[in-house]
A protein has these predicted regions:
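Non-catalytic substrate-recognition/targeting regions of SAM-dependent transferases
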Residues: 106-119, 135-206, 214
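S-adenosyl-L-methionine
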Residues: 255-296
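Mobile active-site "lid"/loop adjacent to the S-adenosyl-L-methionine
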Residues: 292-322
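Non-catalytic accessory regions of SAM-dependent methyltransferases
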Residues: 1-122
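Conserved SAM-binding motif I beta-strand of class I
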Residues: 246-251
Length: 394
């Protein structure tokens, strides 16, 4: 198979020699053959030496590298990559586990498949394209996925309506590529939850907090718990199973509150310990008393672009300052950032600023990140997006 060619400017191949999976538009000297959005191209150095192969896209990231070998991108290629991804999840005990039938099967660059996310919920895989190329190749990828997963996955739902660039004119759609089961209850560490892959955020659930939710369960016994930005209520029902005295879930979205209540009822029917509130987080923190001794702050990304970083850090400081002000002495604070442009150092500084302003004595108990099924490609450290701290507040 002969692909159209992209030639780099002199010296711009150095990052690719270090296996970074992105070719930025500013590194390109010329493009031969006018490739379409999402088309596979070969990348050459200024000396006309092959260096990489990937999906072409108009934008700051011009090529997302699929391989550093000169090979054909076909169904066999997708099968090989998906088989490696599945083997990793098996090693994490996330496949055929009677207590857990949900995991992230493909995590973009972390699985050497930039632009592709696949989450598995029971017998349904939710596939999401974040690049034009993965959208163009979606049907071939779905076929490969079916072959690799066998009976593990019987339904494939494609959910990319909100993740693709509008300018690409790709006709993104949401819908089943294979099957079509209405069953949307999955299992995580023995707890059940509804997955709204039709209209929910991301692929329908935040799989990346699985291990952090499990950790929270250990701290919940006898505590009054506040779960801010609760979305589907994941932290809430782990706290309930951990023996919390009461659990309050807060989210500005009434739809999220409905889903939280459904999930609590699914696991703890009629349990009076839980109450949910559809309210702005900052307003709730302003008006609440000092009844809570375990608080979870897991907000949506405050910054999706670097130009929003300064405002995002102010937002994290303000949010955590409210929690430090109100949490009971001896309380535990779980605080997170999922903003990729906010690194660990920036996030810690924002939280430390809030702690200093509060005048409270604060200790770090745990430093948290994403789980093993959200691997970070060592050559693409930008993939480490989830940061968290567990703090003891005197």
């Amino acid at each position: 198979m002969t692909y159209k060619k992209v030639y780099l400017k002199p010296g711009k191949e150095e990052s690719l020699k270090r296996f970074h999976p992105c070719v930025f538009s500013g590194a390109i000297a010329k493009v031969e053959g006018e490739p379409e959005e999402g088309e596979v191209v070969d990348v050459y150095t200024s000396k006309k030496e092959f260096i990489a192969c990937g999906h072409f896209q108009i934008g700051s990231i011009a090529v997302r590298v699929l391989t550093f070998k000169q090979e054909e991108i076909n169904r066999d290629f997708w099968k090989r990559r998906l088989a490696v991804a599945l083997d990793l999840r098996r090693s994490l005990n996330l496949v055929n586990n009677p207590e857990n039938n949900t995991c992230r099967l493909v995590h973009g660059e972390g699985d050497n498949l930039p632009g592709l996310i696949i989450d598995v919920y029971g017998q349904t895989a939710v596939m999401q394209a974040h690049s034009a190329g993965m959208h163009v190749d979606r049907l071939e990828i779905a076929e490969a996925l079916s072959e690799v997963m066998g009976d593990i996955v019987k339904h494939i739902y494609y959910k990319s309506e909100t993740t693709l660039p509008f300018k690409a004119d790709l006709g993104p759609e949401n819908g089943f590529i294979k099957g079509g089961s209405p069953e949307n209850v999955a299992l995580e560490n023995g707890l059940k939850f509804h997955v709204d892959w039709l209209k929910g955020q991301k692929t329908g659930f935040f799989v990346d907090q699985r291990e952090n939710r499990h950790l929270l369960e250990r701290y919940s016994k006898g505590r009054n718990v506040l779960n801010m930005f609760c979305y589907t209520g994941g932290f809430s029902f782990y706290a309930m199973r951990g023996g919390a005295n009461l659990v309050h879930s807060v989210d500005s979205s009434a739809k999220a509150i409905d889903l939280t209540n459904q999930n609590v009822e699914l696991n703890f029917p009629g349990d009076p310990r839980h109450e949910a509130f559809a309210e702005d987080a900052f307003k709730y923190l302003d008006r609440m008393g000092d009844q809570y001794d375990l608080i979870i702050l897991d907000p949506p990304a405050f910054a999706k672009h670097r130009d929003a970083l300064r405002n995002a850090l102010r937002g994290y400081s303000k949010l955590n300052a409210k929690a430090f002000e109100k949490i009971k002495p001896g309380g535990i604070l779980f605080t997170f950032s999922c903003s990729q442009v906010v690194d660990k150092k920036d996030f810690r500084n924002a939280v430390f600023t809030a702690a200093a302003q509060s005048g409270r004595s604060v200790r770090i108990l745990h430093q948290l990140t994403q789980p093993g099924d959200h691997p970070v490609n060592i050559y693409h450290p930008e993939g480490e997006y989830l940061k968290g701290l567990v703090l003891y507040v005197e």
